[in-house]
């Protein structure tokens, strides 16, 4: 089975349409764009009907299989898109295998699955897919990892005709990590705002800051530089957007551990003294901290002590326990109090 990424899809389609596409992943933007692109090309080749089914225990497989056999005899070419559940029961495997075995050239099959669990590739239905090789394509629609996101953003800006420098790309990655849909919208807005199509840090941050939708990363940035009022305002926005407190807690925890790693002492320290900044550039490089985030960490390092950090981490644990026990405004009140403490 041939495996590609969404950004390789246009090149693949230029060489011809496959019989079966397996979209694996959970990123809403990549799944939507990938399926839309496949369907647009298929429409041009006569596949003018589409049947989308969310597969569950109520799915009528007998009717589905019968309709596939009828297509081409009585009906026009059709795209069949199946959203599969994560749990591949024995019955689901059997039905999939039977469906795949009756496919013909007038049916274009698109399968969507959140993840390919260990062992799926050994299941009979998956093996049966390979009979259509090389006309079976697996497309990875997982959200790019932190390491791969800069490359993805660079390719996306280039495809849009935008000229983004490294700092602009880094800021886009940081601000919209795990939210490609918001990233796409930000790029579209930047394209409209700047006719010269050039993107730098200042232009990107202006769009990020003006966004009516706050992100946990904006809250983190405000905390690092000690802007308590801004941090509390963002926190209220996140609460209004129904962001889960646990997401904020885990994001903050990760940044605090990064601070500890950056300032790892080489000798005994006094916990009430400010965090050490010796060899800080070396540590920034070792941990691959983006250039535009280094001043933020420096601001926090020059303001905080180990004792304060440990107290903050302990309070994070207390708030997380509270968040898991009950859903109340008290969690948000404690997060606001913690924000002030970090900014002092």
Curated annotation (Swiss-Prot):
Q: How does it assemble?
A: DNA polymerase III contains a core (composed of alpha, epsilon and theta chains) that associates with a tau subunit. This core dimerizes to form the POLIII' complex. PolIII' associates with the gamma complex (composed of gamma, delta, delta', psi and chi chains) and with the beta chain to form the complete DNA polymerase III complex.
**Which parts of the chain are coiled coil?**
none
Protein name, UniProt field? DNA polymerase III subunit delta
Q: What gene is this protein a product of?
A: holA
Q: Which reaction equations make up its catalytic activity?
A: DNA(n) + a 2'-deoxyribonucleoside 5'-triphosphate = DNA(n+1) + diphosphate
Lineage, opening ranks: Bacteria, Pseudomonadati, Pseudomonadota, Gammaproteobacteria, Pasteurellales
Query: Keyword annotations for this protein?
Result: DNA replication, DNA-directed DNA polymerase, Nucleotidyltransferase, Transferase
* Any single biological process term in GO: DNA-templated DNA replication
Tell me, in a sentence or two, what this protein's role is.
Answer: DNA polymerase III is a complex, multichain enzyme responsible for most of the replicative synthesis in bacteria. This DNA polymerase also exhibits 3' to 5' exonuclease activity. The delta subunit seems to interact with the gamma subunit to transfer the beta subunit on the DNA.
So what EC number does this one have? 2.7.7.7
Pfam families named in the record? DNA_pol3_delt_C, DNA_pol3_delta
Q: Which CDD domains match?
A: HLD_clamp_pol_III_delta
Name the protein family. Belongs to the DNA polymerase HolA subunit family.
The Gene Ontology CC terms held by the record are: DNA polymerase III complex
Q: Name one GO molecular function term.
A: DNA binding
Which InterPro entries does the record match to this protein? DNA_pol3_clamp-load_cplx_C, DNA_pol3_delt_C, DNA_pol3_delta_N, DNA_polIII_delta, P-loop_NTPase
Carries keyword Transferase?
A: yes
